[in-house]
């Protein structure tokens, strides 16, 4: 098997409207208009050409399940989010990269990832 790419990441959220406000209003993702008419609530988002699917359901606990958003400048991103009242972990090095975490309104962990020198 040779996958071409990751098509989407699906995340369970307790409140679709609150999650949609957070992901679009705070994290800057854009809502996609092409979500099929599924029986469960949800929304499709675009994150730099990658899809993030919000699905109404119970989110799992902990940091083990998360996805990462690549950011250009982690310090600027943390400052901007904290200025908006969003709780963000302090940055920490991971190899040549750096990361910090935020949580959406349902408690899902989102890694903010700044790539290091190759």
Give the predicted meaning of each segment.
Residues 42, 51, 68, 99-100, ...:
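Short hydrophobic/aromatic beta-strand element in the GNAT-like acyltransferase core
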Residues 66-83:
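Mid-chain, well-packed structural core segment of small domains
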Residues 21-22, 80, 106:
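Structural preference for long, well-ordered alpha-helical segments within the folded cores
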Residues 1-2, 84-118:
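Vicinal oxygen chelate
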Residues 37-41, 62-63, 94-98:
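Short acidic/glycine-enriched loop/turn segments that link adjacent beta-strands
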Residues 10-50:
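Core segments of cupin and vicinal oxygen chelate
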Residues 1-18, 65-67, 116-118:
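N-terminal beta-strand motif that seeds the catalytic metal site of vicinal oxygen chelate
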């Amino acid at each position: 098997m040779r996958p071409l790419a990751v098509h989407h990441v699906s995340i369970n959220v307790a409140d679709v409207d609150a999650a949609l406000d957070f992901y679009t209003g705070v994290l800057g993702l854009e809502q996609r208009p092409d979500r099929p008419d599924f029986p469960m609530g949800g929304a499709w988002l675009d994150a730099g050409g990658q899809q993030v699917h919000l699905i109404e359901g119970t989110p799992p606990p902990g940091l083990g399940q998360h996805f990462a958003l690549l950011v250009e400048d982690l310090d600027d991103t943390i400052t901007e989010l904290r200025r908006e009242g969003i709780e963000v972990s302090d940055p920490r090095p991971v190899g040549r990269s750096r990361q910090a975490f935020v949580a959406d309104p349902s408690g899902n962990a989102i890694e903010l990832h700044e790539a290091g020198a190759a």
